[in-house]
Amino acid sequence: MPKIEVKNDDLELALKKFKRISLEVRRLAQRHEYHLRKGMRLREKQKIAQKKRRKFRSLASH
């Protein structure tokens, strides 16, 4: 479980940091959940990149 120190009673910043760290931990656990062949791993990586591009393109248009 990630630990975050709250400095200067700044709870909002501490929550942001905690969410970011816990998300990284979940992604790492999900990635190592089972073994993927090299080609499959590359396809998964490309899918994730494509989703990110779509997300940021839709945000840029607003």
From Swiss-Prot:
Identification of the protein by name: Small ribosomal subunit protein bS21
Taxon lineage: Bacteria, Bacillati, Mycoplasmatota, Mycoplasmoidales, Mycoplasmoidaceae
Keywords: Ribonucleoprotein, Ribosomal protein
Family of this protein: Belongs to the bacterial ribosomal protein bS21 family.
Gene Ontology biological process terms in this record: translation
GO cellular component, one term: ribosome
Family matches, as InterPro entries: Ribosomal_bS21
MF GO annotations: structural constituent of ribosome
Superkingdom of origin organism: Bacteria
Organism whose genome encodes this protein: Mycoplasma genitalium (strain ATCC 33530 / DSM 19775 / NCTC 10195 / G37) (Mycoplasmoides genitalium)
Protein's UniProt keywords contain Ribonucleoprotein: yes
This protein's record includes keyword Transmembrane: no
